């Protein structure tokens, strides 16, 4: 009798993706983050669904409805904090996943990488709109500041902003449409993730050496299913430590004040996972220039495959490139710190230097380092 796992039309797809999938025998824990992102997405969709059952997207009642969820709904507080901190875990996994791709040269799978960049942008858009929904001070002013950036677009800017707002300021229409988009986008992300996986399985996974591993493959189950379960346990442990012990650690106290258009908070800043891009935006004195730098700080990832000059795929055996990579990581941490600081000396100049460094490392230093390493290979 043939195995149903291998013959049933639906089971066959699952089998070929998660059970009998040939995987390299030497992939490290850095390859766990793809499955962890899937878990994060499922968790966010489920908690978000239960929150949407009790949330009202009206400016008069949005803040109160979130308070109601935390106070009156059975386990509403844990669902709300799992959703809020789940977003943070999502972005930690995303940054690790992208970092892994950069370090080990996974960006040479062009289709997979480009879908990944689109996924990153979509997730950032979703998270931004979700932050607006509780309708606290930082929600309102964050929405105002970030949507207002579109007014920097020549000629159509102002019309575009008012079209997105649905009026002349961030108001009821804006909140309602942001809720609608925030609800639908995770399902689009899920669909894109499947396409991401489809393209990945066309080529098979990369591995730490960057050398083709066709000669040495092992089945995904049980080896990597067990490994992924370990990663999932650690992810859930970290999330629950955050949720149950310090649920507001990563939030902003200003968001516990209902939105007030007449009172601007002293420091408007987004959630921690956007601070690096926010720092780059603020570093440029010109509005349009800042917006372009902000967009390019993410879209530059799409250029990385074109900037690959090395004869080797992975950075595993390239010490100079490794140095550049870790300097880039340190630079991103610096930008994240600067994004949360007020706009005053010495933070302004540090932010400007870190922003220049960010683009300089990716566009100049990494290709140069690769070329030097290529020449060192010929050195006798």
Curated annotation (Swiss-Prot):
Keyword terms: Electron transport, Heme, Iron, Membrane, Metal-binding, Mitochondrion, Mitochondrion inner membrane, Respiratory chain, Transmembrane, Transmembrane helix, Transport, Ubiquinone
UniProt-annotated location(s): Mitochondrion inner membrane
InterPro entries, alphabetized: Cyt_b/b6_C, Cyt_b/b6_C_sf, Cyt_b/b6_N, Cytb/b6-like_sf, Cytochrome_b, Cytochrome_b_C_euk/bac, Cytochrome_b_N_euk/bac, Di-haem_cyt_TM
One GO molecular-function entry: metal ion binding
GO cellular component terms, A-Z: mitochondrial inner membrane; respiratory chain complex III
Signal peptide from the UniProt entry: none
Reported function: Component of the ubiquinol-cytochrome c reductase complex (complex III or cytochrome b-c1 complex) that is part of the mitochondrial respiratory chain. The b-c1 complex mediates electron transfer from ubiquinol to cytochrome c. Contributes to the generation of a proton gradient across the mitochondrial membrane that is then used for ATP synthesis.
Name this protein carries in UniProt: Cytochrome b
Organism this protein belongs to: Rupicapra rupicapra (Alpine chamois)
């Amino acid at each position: 009798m043939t195995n149903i796992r291998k013959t049933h039309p639906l089971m066959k797809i699952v089998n070929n993706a998660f059970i009998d999938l040939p995987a390299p025998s030497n992939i490290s824990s850095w390859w766990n983050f793809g499955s962890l992102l899937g878990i994060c997405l499922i968790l966010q969709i489920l908690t978000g669904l239960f929150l949407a059952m009790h949330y009202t997207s009206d400016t008069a009642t949005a803040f109160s409805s979130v308070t109601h969820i935390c106070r009156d709904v059975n386990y509403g507080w844990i669902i709300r904090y799992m959703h809020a901190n789940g977003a943070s875990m999502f972005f930690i996994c995303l940054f690790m996943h992208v970092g892994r791709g950069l370090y080990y040269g996974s960006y040479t799978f062009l289709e997979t990488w480009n879908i990944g960049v689109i996924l990153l942008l979509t997730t950032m858009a979703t998270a931004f709109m979700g932050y607006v929904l509780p309708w606290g001070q930082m929600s309102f002013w964050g929405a105002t500041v970030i949507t207002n950036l579109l007014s920097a677009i020549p000629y159509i800017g102002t019309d575009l902003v008012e079209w997105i707002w649905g009026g002349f300021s961030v108001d009821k229409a804006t909140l309602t449409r942001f809720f609608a988009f925030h609800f639908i986008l995770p399902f689009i992300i899920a669909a894109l993730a499947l396409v991401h996986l489809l393209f990945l399985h066309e080529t098979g996974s990369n591995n730490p050496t960057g050398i083709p591993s066709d000669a040495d493959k092992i089945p995904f189950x049980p080896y990597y299913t067990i490994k992924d379960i370990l990663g999932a346990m650690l992810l859930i442990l970290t999330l629950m430590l955050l949720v149950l012990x310090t649920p507001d650690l990563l939030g902003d106290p200003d968001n516990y004040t209902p939105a007030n258009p007449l009172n601007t908070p002293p420091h408007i800043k987004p959630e921690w996972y956007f601070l690096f891009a926010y720092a780059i935006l603020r570093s440029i004195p010109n509005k349009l220039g800042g917006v372009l730098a902000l967009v390019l700080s993410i879209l530059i990832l799409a250029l990385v495959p074109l900037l690959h000059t090395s004869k080797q795929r992975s950075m595993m055996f390239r010490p100079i490139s490794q140095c550049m990579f870790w300097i880039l990581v340190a630079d991103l941490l610096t930008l994240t710190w600067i994004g949360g600081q007020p706009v005053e000396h010495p933070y302004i100049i540090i932010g400007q230097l870190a922003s220049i460094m960010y683009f300089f490392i990716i566009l100049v230093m990494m290709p140069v380092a690769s070329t030097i390493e290529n020449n060192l290979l010929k050195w006798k």
